[in-house]
Design a protein with these regions (language model features):
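Conserved class I S-adenosyl-L-methionine
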Residues: 56-66
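Conserved SAM-binding loop of SAM-dependent methyltransferases across substrates and taxa
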Residues: 67-80
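Conserved SAM-binding loop
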Residues: 96-97
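Conserved SAM-binding strand-loop segment of SAM-dependent methyltransferases
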Residues: 104-118
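A short acidic, Gly/Pro-enriched loop at the edge of an enzyme's catalytic core
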Residues: 119-129
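A short glycine-rich, Lys/Arg-flanked "PGG" loop and its adjoining helix->strand segment in the class I
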Residues: 144-158
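SAM-dependent methyltransferase
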Residues: 163-234
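C-terminal lobe and adjacent flexible extensions of AdoMet/dcAdoMet transferase-like proteins
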Residues: 225-281
């Protein structure tokens, strides 16, 4: 969503006239360091496709690609891999071109960034389409989300697979903040508001720093909280042949997930969970 003045990014804290850690930080770098793990994500997508289709995928389309960090990881994996990143935010794509694509060497010729609407993108069919980090939750109506899923279906080769993720659990319905400390900053996930009737939710990401400065509203998301049954039903209605949910295992030494995702028919009623979903054409 476009940030309104109420939700616009602001730099806070620090003494007047002095540079702060927040003023010198890059929100995209902070996001990639705290939210993304493109290596593990591509490991899962690549391995799962090969298990399901008994071949190596080559063509990948990353919807809502942002900085195209994931697309860049894809073209680094194999010399025949190609990636297409689709996003409406041209400024973020330009950041990705400068900080990621330009550093790829020869692989930069195998990545294409499209400044287009994912609902209308028209390009060659691909093996894989990705919609990660819950980005598709921007579509709040069933008909619109089904339309998006159908456009993905039509954009895949005959044995193509659509990969997406989702989160839930009792904490997902709460207005709450969760802080995660890193070496030189703290990531703050802010579920600012939730409407249980419509499912509308407003989520934000903030970053704070040891010098007391802060980036408020570094990122803002105006979403609908979709449930797994709804997502599965809409994928099947859009034409996909089989939909599989991959549940994350538990780390024996902590209450956190272990990063290993396996196919599951039933899940645990945890306070918070994240899953991958595959939808096979």
């Amino acid at each position: 969503m476009a940030a309104t003045p109420r939700h616009a990014m602001t730099i806070q804290g620090g003494k007047k006239g002095r540079d702060t850690m927040a003023s010198k930080a890059d929100r995209h770098v902070l996001y990639e360091d705290s939210v993304q793990c493109v290596e593990a994500e591509i490991d899962f997508v690549d391995d799962t496709f090969k298990k399901l289709r008994n071949r190596k995928p080559r063509l990948l389309r990353e919807d809502f690609c942002g900085t195209a960090n994931t697309s860049c990881e894809w073209v680094r994996r194999r010399k025949r891999n190609r990636a297409f990143g689709v996003d409406l935010d041209e400024n973020v794509q330009q950041w990705g071109m400068k900080h990621h694509v330009a550093k790829l060497g020869e692989a930069r010729d195998r990545i294409t960034l499209l400044n287009e609407n994912v609902l209308d993108v028209d390009m060659e069919p691909v093996d894989i389409v990705l919609a990660m980090n819950f980005s598709y939750w921007i579509f709040k109506e069933r008909d619109l989300l089904r339309r998006y899923f159908r456009s993905v279906y039509e954009g895949l080769v005959d044995d193509g697979i659509f990969f997406l993720d989702a989160y839930g659990g009792s904490d997902a319905y709460k207005e709450m903040r969760e802080r995660t400390k890193y070496d030189d900053f703290t990531y703050i996930w802010d579920q600012a508001s939730f409407d249980p009737i419509s499912g509308d939710m407003l989520c934000k990401i903030h970053f704070s720093f040891p010098d007391g400065s802060r980036i408020k509203n570094a990122f803002t998301y105006d979403w609908r909280l979709w449930t797994l049954p709804e997502i599965r039903e809409l994928l099947l209605e859009a034409g996909f042949e089989r939909v599989t949910v991959y549940w994350q295992g538990d780390d024996e030494d902590s209450d956190e997930g272990n990063g290993e995702f396996e196919p599951a028919e039933r899940g645990e009623a945890d306070e918070a969970w994240i899953v991958y979903i595959s939808a096979e054409k």
